[in-house]
Amino acid sequence: MNAPHRDETTASHRDDGFFTESLESRDPEIFAASQKELGRQRDEIELIASENIVSAAVMEAQGGVMTNKYAEGYPGRRYYGGCQYVDIAEELAIDRAKQLFGCDFANVQPNSGSQANQGVFTALLQPGDTILGMSLDAGGHLTHGARPNQSGKWFNAVQYGVREGDLEIDYDQIAALAAEHKPKMIIAGGSAIPRIIDFARMREIADTIGAYLLVDMAHFAGMVASGHYPSPFPHAHVATTTTHKTLRGPRGGMIVTNDEAIAKKVNSAIFPGIQGGPLMHVIAGKAVAFGEALRPEFRDYQTQVIANAQALAAQLIKGGLDIVTGGTDTHLMLVDLRAKGVKGNATEKALGRAHITCNKNGIPFDTEKPMVTSGLRLGSPAGTTRGFGEAEFRQIADWIVEVVDGLAANGEDANDAVEAKVRGEVQALCDRFPIYPNL
């Protein structure tokens, strides 16, 4: 019997390294960029509050074969065959999410926190409806009705802020705006809120006008899961989150609720409403991260995240920097730089040259432009994942003060010596707390 004919194209394809060749060999430019990014993460202190460092297991799941699978629909109800194994991953992610947040329904398909919010809007609102969210200037998020965002274009977006005295959320203003504008949805949460939000008060206001309460817990979801931050439930009708940040998972989004009717609308809004096939490799990574978050050590991690943030804030205050609201209850803080006479953009760059990564950020009632700002946003999740404790974060605060004082005294073009000194000390600290030794 003759051997089956071997197609030359197939033979060539299988022998050309497609399934075996390393990234370094196949695409040296991307490999080089990836290695440089690995070096940056290893050798610099990450203080961006919305960033974290995932486990090797999460990265392995994200880089696995589930990236090949199209899976439109939901587990057990797919539009393609061959989904029996990716169904396992999504079902695990859903079940673990429900355990983490004590809720009855979870949709783990949103590709980002922004798409999770868009999914809720699609499920519960109509274009032209009124929404009430925190202004970006006060610490809100683009997707809560900011004018440049789709949420500010499709909806009549009314914005609330903070009190001028203590710079905390102005619940009386929210109540007044709700009574005046009758929004269909009130949004709690934001991207730069250092204090715990009063969800009960927000729901009370929502109920007076029959509005939905959406809690965007993207920044503090990890602390909700560990019990360090009050749960949005039973107050929220629905909650959204990213799956990175304090949850320490892959970049993605999620929607959770206890309301079955809302859950059905949300599922239809995500697929087929605003997304097609979900990213199954990312959902696998989410499942792994949620499993990690169910372990006792995750609670210990969140305890340290908060302790580190508070140590950082207190030491910065000792160094003469102002902290918005005077401190933090969470993982993040806003630093008011006006007393030092420097801007957020220049300070971000100076700290970056010293290998301390953070982001410029507007402060409440800031008069500077968004690309300039009078402040910085700092966070502790990534450093805590590395193993830093309060002592390390107090040292980091001292370095920040040193760079800021140098910038104020010397200017951007003459602060090299200070930045180089701090950069060397940062390297020594990072060497003591390595990440990804097998990469």
Swiss-Prot record:
Nuclease keyword on record: no
Names of required cofactors: pyridoxal 5'-phosphate
EC class name: transferase
Subunit annotation: Homodimer.
Pathway the protein acts in: One-carbon metabolism; tetrahydrofolate interconversion; Amino-acid biosynthesis; glycine biosynthesis; glycine from L-serine: step 1/1
Subcellular locations according to the entry: Cytoplasm
One Pfam family from the record: SHMT
Transmembrane spans: none
Gene Ontology biological process terms from the UniProt entry: glycine biosynthetic process from serine; tetrahydrofolate interconversion
Role according to the record: Catalyzes the reversible interconversion of serine and glycine with tetrahydrofolate (THF) serving as the one-carbon carrier. This reaction serves as the major source of one-carbon groups required for the biosynthesis of purines, thymidylate, methionine, and other important biomolecules. Also exhibits THF-independent aldolase activity toward beta-hydroxyamino acids, producing glycine and aldehydes, via a retro-aldol mechanism.
List of residues binding (6S)-5,6,7,8-tetrahydrofolate: 136, 140-142
Keyword Cytoplasm assigned: yes
Matches recorded under InterPro entries: PyrdxlP-dep_Trfase, PyrdxlP-dep_Trfase_major, PyrdxlP-dep_Trfase_small, Ser_HO-MeTrfase, Ser_HO-MeTrfase-like, Ser_HO-MeTrfase_PLP_BS, SHMT-like_dom
Gene Ontology terms: cellular component: cytosol
Residue numbers bearing the N6-(pyridoxal phosphate)lysine modification: 245
Keywords from the UniProt entry: Amino-acid biosynthesis, Cytoplasm, One-carbon metabolism, Pyridoxal phosphate, Transferase
Catalysis: reaction(s): (6R)-5,10-methylene-5,6,7,8-tetrahydrofolate + glycine + H2O = (6S)-5,6,7,8-tetrahydrofolate + L-serine
Enzyme Commission designation: 2.1.2.1
Record site feature (Plays an important role in substrate specificity), residues: 244
Family of the protein in this entry: Belongs to the SHMT family.
Entries under SUPFAM superfamilies matching the protein: PLP-dependent transferases
Name under which the protein is recorded: Serine hydroxymethyltransferase
PROSITE patterns: SHMT
HAMAP family in the cross-refs: SHMT
GO molecular function, one term: glycine hydroxymethyltransferase activity
